[in-house]
Curated annotation (Swiss-Prot):
This is Serine/threonine-protein kinase AGC1-7. Residues 146-480 form the Protein kinase domain. Interacts with PDPK1/PDK1. The active site is at D271. It holds the Pfam family Pkinase. Residues 84-118 have a biased composition (Low complexity). Its EC number is 2.7.11.1. The gene is AGC1-7.
């Protein structure tokens, strides 16, 4: 399996890391493609001073949706919340007092936190059924309730394992993060941010957090296991290592809906790349890895009302009926077009606007703005080949960076490479800033696809497609013509992975999976967020061919 180089830089360390939630297919053990690695470092193109160090802030401060950070997760040494918050131009959170009253319902004890909130998209999920069967008996889930089977991947702040809930035949992906390592590298808030974001999500193309708990040494997140690997690994298996345009359109459509939902919640993803797009058992996708995400407040604003509401408007106004002053609105737009796709498309004067649901027969659906573009983060985070120019220049960035990375993402799916990759990482950053976008002659890509990529990869964020109207503007682009957004979950995926055979993990309930006190060697390349593992040739004592054995020394 070919590997793909990449780096994640951090101003506090020189080690290189891979992404933290990369789940390769089960049949890949030691030949998993190495994903490009994110970076978190001072900008190399500071216009005022080249040596200016912009300290990265953890992405998890202002939030109108979730409770305040858990008191059980201590502030890491050297962290400065006030200084980090000063990098964000967001509205103050006025809901903290109300949220704090709900903290008693969330346990951050050493055993477990597990609940099944009302999440429509997880209805009928056998994983929730299995979890609820145990928790309804008063059981607080902990590490002892899971049988660790195999390490799936590792990244900057943790390792991901395939696990089985004991007494059931349900399987999960468990992300394990070492507390001491996170604290020593000032990354506790990153782990906390990911947990709180995952707890908030309810979307068919985003992860479900089934439980989270901590032990004396670890934080653990129990999530959905995706047996199909990731899009980077899948792309490597395609002819010429690139997807057909139909396949790329399918994957891009589902990613777009996930980004739309995140932006509606005030979450800037900041880490889109094929390695972080996992393939579920049914062939649909799931975004992963939210430790670099930025959370901020976002307030929906009515940009265009329906003709029903606009009917009472004054006829003497020169402004189009139902529109507010664009300058008075927050830049960026998110519309409920996931559910009413064709209603929101602009219509000709003589064309009747008709809703599939019988609504607004003589008009159009209202458009809402909920795109967090006004936030200005100074963090230098991401992956070299996917970094937006405004991040490299240190100008501060908002949600427009996700649309830049979306353009790079589509380009890579279609061409099998990223457009600005240079001889090294520094050359790549220079190319992002100064090199014009070019398209290879082969493979052949439609003009509609190239036009969309050009619109997304505009170096000035204010001129970038989707800056004013968010995902809706992208949905209406000719590249996505024919996509039924409301029924995309019913569409046939271009690739459905082979079912995973879990029979080799038939439980014998051996206690040989208990903690191994010694025998592990420190992994000096930063894998697993600094966790020590007994991987490679340095395995602790045990039968490594036994499917019940896992070479992780802490369990």
């Amino acid at each position: 399996m070919l590997t793909k180089p990449g780096k994640k830089l951090d101003s506090s360390e020189s080690t290189h890391h891979t992404t933290s939630s990369n789940y390769p297919p089960l049949d890949i053990v030691h030949q998993t493609p190495q994903p490009r690695k994110e970076m978190q470092q001072k900008p190399l193109f500071d216009p005022k001073k080249m040596d200016n160090l912009i300290k990265p802030e953890p992405a998890g401060f202002t939030n109108h949706h979730r409770p305040n950070p858990s008191p059980k997760i201590p502030s890491s040494p050297g962290s400065n919340m006030t200084e980090s918050q000063s990098n964000l131009n967001t509205k103050p959170n006025n809901n903290n007092s109300n949220n704090n009253s709900n903290m008693s319902s969330r346990s951050n004890s050493i055993e477990s936190t597990s609940s099944n909130p009302s999440k429509p998209h997880t209805g009928g999920d056998i994983r929730w059924d299995a979890v609820n069967t145990l928790t309804s008996k008063g059981v607080q889930l902990g590490i002892s309730d899971f049988r660790l089977l195999k390490r799936l991947g590792y990244g900057d702040i943790g390792s991901v394992y395939l696990v089985e809930l004991r007494g059931t035949i349900t399987y999960f992906a468990m992300k394990v993060m070492d507390k001491a390592s996170l604290a020593s590298r000032n990354k506790l808030l990153r782990a906390q941010t990911e947990r709180e974001i995952l707890s908030q999500l309810d979307h068919p193309f985003l992860p479900t957090l089934y439980s989270h708990f901590e032990t004396d040494k670890f934080y653990c997140l129990v999530m959905e296991f995706c047996g199909g690997g990731n899009l980077y690994s899948l792309r490597q298996k395609q002819p010429n290592k690139c997807f057909t345009e139909d396949a790329a359109r399918f994957f891009a459509s589902e990613v777009l809906l996930a980004l739309e939902y995140l932006h509606m919640l005030g979450i800037v993803y900041r880490d889109l790349k094929p390695e972080n797009v996992l393939v579920r058992d049914d062939g649909h996708i799931m975004l992963s890895d939210f430790d670099l995400s930025l959370r901020c407040s976002v307030s929906p604003t009515l940009v265009k009302s329906s003709s029903v509401h606009a009917a009472g408007g004054g006829s003497g106004s020169s402004r189009p009926v139902g529109l507010i002053d664009e300058d008075a609105a927050v830049q960026g737009c998110i519309q409920p077009s996931t559910f009413f796709p064709r209603i929101l498309q602009s219509s000709k004067k003589n064309r009747k606007a008709k809703s599939d649901f019988g609504l607004f027969v003589n008009g159009s659906m209202p458009e809402l703005m909920a795109e967090p573009t006004n936030v200005k983060s100074m963090s230098f985070v991401g992956t070299h080949e996917y970094l937006a120019p405004e991040i490299i220049r240190g100008e501060g960035h908002g949600s427009a960076v996700d649309w830049w990375t979306f353009g790079i993402f589509i380009y890579e799916l279609l061409y099998g490479a990223t457009p600005f990759k240079g001889q090294g990482n520094r050359a790549t950053l220079h190319n992002v800033i100064g090199q014009a976008l070019r398209f290879p002659e082969v493979p052949h890509v439609s003009s509609a696809a190239r036009d969309l990529i050009k619109g997304l990869l505009v170096k000035e964020p204010q001129k970038r497609i989707a800056y004013k109207r968010g995902a809706t503007e992208i949905k209406q682009h000719p590249f996505f013509e024919g996509v039924n957004w409301a029924l995309i979950r019913s569409a046939t995926p271009p690739h459905v992975p082979e079912p995973v055979d879990f029979s080799c993990y038939a439980s014998k309930d051996k206690e040989s999976m208990a903690a191994v006190d010694g025998g592990g060697k420190k992994n000096n390349n930063g894998a697993g967020g600094g966790c020590s593992t007994g991987g490679g040739d340095n395995k602790p004592n045990g039968d490594c061919n036994d499917p019940d054995y896992i070479d992780f020394e802490y369990f």
